Amino acid sequence: MDIATGPESLDRCFTRGPSDCAKMLDTIKMEDHPLRTGTATLGVLLGSECQHQAVCEGCQRPISDRFLMRVNEASWHEECLQCTVCQQPLTTSCYFRDRKLFCKQDYQQLFAAKCSGCMEKIAPTEFVMRALECVYHLSCFCCCVCERQLRKGDEFVLKEGQLLCKSDYEKEKDLLSSGSPDDSDSVKSDDEEGDVKPGKGRVNQGKGSDDGKDPRRPKRPRTILTTQQRRAFKASFEVSSKPCRKVRETLAAETGLSVRVVQVWFQNQRAKIKKLARRHQQQQEQQNSQRLGQEVMSSRMEGMMTSYAPLAPSQQQIVTMDQNSYSTDPFQQGLTPPQMPGDHMNPYGNDTIFHDIDSDTSLTSLSDCFLASSEVTSMQARVGNPIDRLYSMQSSYFAS
């Protein structure tokens, strides 16, 4: 395949006598001089004496005109050198590709670089964004889902000719990994069933069908939507997620796609929305269950703490002591231990310190078993230290 290298200059050649014919074609010169008369001149005009007469590349006939055109070492009639598309004569420059001639306007329209997003041609002076073999306008280099314009440094994925930002690609990956949509999404309305062929009904018989898993079965062609087509579909989906036949036909006419492609896109979009709603509901249920478990645990902990709380002051009993219930003088002065045979066993007397405690009274807490610190100190001051009592007994014994 020949590739055009740019506009070719057209040269005009003037044919002379038989000795100069090949020379003039090789050097690509243009000359104009008076015609000679006579037999030789007539032979030159008829081309009978020119053994290397030029043949037109377009019509494949010998060139007997006074002037001829040369393009890529090929000769052309002036009337044959014209654009293949618009049929306009080429006088100053042309583009040559696949053995065909084009003018500048038609060549740029057919073979110039086109944006992979909007499919419009890209001017030579425009800035572009490249992704592998695809070229985009700066405004068309955006995510096909969220339509966010991708800039230098952003992470994206080029999947089947469509640009996806990182977040939307991960969402789509999670949707695909979670499983296929429910069978309820494949149910079609009455007007949709007319567009489906009866022979394709076995595809939706169940998940156990081997039709989709047969490696020998050829894959169906995947339709890649442009940005304008996707915007038109989304705008119609916001109005109605299940449009009627008339709306689908209108969308198909506007986008240049078939009615079947429009119908399949709406089915896939409904399944996607339903799957997202189901996932959101599962997340809400999981959060509610976690919150309920935390509330149950906190209520149990509060119950355990309240079961070990101290008793109210009205329920606590403090043991009090009466000063008149015991004698401050455990023995009589002037009596010695031998004169009081039983006093050496009970030097402080037989009276008990604690009185008036009913047998029915029970200790309800550990605080009932202890006296206040101030009361214990006052009692020790009144009773005295036992060591001091022993010394006083000894001094009274020897004094007697």
UniProtKB/Swiss-Prot annotation:
Residues 54-113, 114-175 form the LIM zinc-binding domain. It comes from Xenopus laevis. InterPro entries: HD (IPR001356), Homeobox_CS (IPR017970), Homeodomain-like_sf (IPR009057), LIM_Homeobox_TF (IPR050453), Znf_LIM (IPR001781). Gene3D superfamilies: Cysteine Rich Protein, Homeodomain-like. Induction: By activin; retinoic acid (RA) inhibits this up-regulation. Expression in neurons is regulated by calcium (Ca2+) activity: the lower the activity, the larger the number of neurons showing expression. Required for early specification of the kidney glomus, lying upstream of wt1 in the pathway controlling glomus differentiation. The balance in levels and expression patterns of binding partners such as lhx1/lim-1 influences differentiation into glomus or tubule derivatives. Involved in specification of serotonergic neurons. Transmembrane segments: none annotated. SUPFAM superfamilies: Glucocorticoid receptor-like (DNA-binding domain), Homeodomain-like. This is LIM homeobox transcription factor 1-beta.1. It is found in: Nucleus. Shows a temporal expression pattern in three main areas: neural, kidney and limbs. From stage 13 onwards, expressed in regions of the nervous system including the placodes and otic vesicles, eye, specific sets of neurons, and in discreet regions of the neural tube. From stage 13, also expressed in the presumptive pronephros, and from stage 27 expression is predominant in the capsule of the pronephric glomus. Also expressed in the developing forelimbs and hindlimbs. In metamorphosing tadpoles, expressed in the eye, brain, muscle and mesonephric kidney. Signal peptide: none annotated. GO terms for biological process: glomus development; neuron differentiation; pronephric nephron tubule development; regulation of transcription by RNA polymerase II. GO terms for molecular function: DNA-binding transcription factor activity; DNA-binding transcription factor activity, RNA polymerase II-specific; metal ion binding; RNA polymerase II transcription regulatory region sequence-specific DNA binding.
